[in-house]
Amino acid sequence: MALLEICCYSMECALTAQRNGADRIELCAAPKEGGLTPSLGVLRSVREHITIPVHPIIRPRGGDFYYTDGEFAAMLEDIRLVRELGFPGLVTGVLTVDGDVDMSRMEKIMAAAGPLAVTFHRAFDMCANPFNALKNLADAGVARVLTSGQKADAAQGLSIIMELIAQGDAPTIMAGAGVRANNLQNFLDAGVREVHSSAGVLLPSPMRYRNQGLSMSADIQADEYSRYRVEGAAVAEMKGIIVRHQAK
């Protein structure tokens, strides 16, 4: 049966995902940045209360995936922490300035991760040649690759995702970016074995007083009065589609 991974940005979201049938959680902070390394407090809380597998993302900042030496050192330290806390896997990715997988740094990441399953995240979609990148990641021992097929969303990139799946069984190709209940069946019919979804909605802030002329974000258009939340019904609906597909 296909595996359903839900992207969660809080303890609350992780509990919702677990209750509604998620098979695994990618744990992140900062949804507006596309996901950054969670805080130690969140990591410890999730480790204590969530029983399904949780893979924290290791990403020190938003933007591109070429990191300074200092940023990369922090990533390795975060990986060691995630390993010490007992998580079964992690999510990360590093590129060279030419858009290739940085194999030298991936070797260090794999060594730091040890027995943890490593997912290479959508830095893969920023690679110059996805097929060369996949081969290199297979050689590195990466467990899976999260990809939208190098398109804005996975529905547009499905043909490339299918080509990547055809390259072999390892790493597992996990389709993500815009995967929802209304298009999930297309991925299952294409032979995708793992799917990744935010299954999220924006929850309005309960704040009554609002200073509408001020933003805490560098993006002055950012909505200060909403936050991301996993929608339990969306997770349950997707899990139901997967179960019914398996029963065919």
From Swiss-Prot:
Gene Ontology MF term list: copper ion binding
Disulfide bonds: none
GO CC term, one of those recorded: cytoplasm
Keyword Glycosyltransferase: no
Subcellular location: Cytoplasm
Ranges in a coiled coil: none
UniProt main location, coarse: cytoplasm
Keyword tags: Cytoplasm
Classification via Pfam families: CutC
Family: Belongs to the CutC family.
HAMAP family for this protein: CutC (MF_00795)
Subunit structure, as described in the record: Homodimer.
Name of the protein described by the UniProt record: PF03932 family protein CutC
Organism: Salmonella enteritidis PT4 (strain P125109)
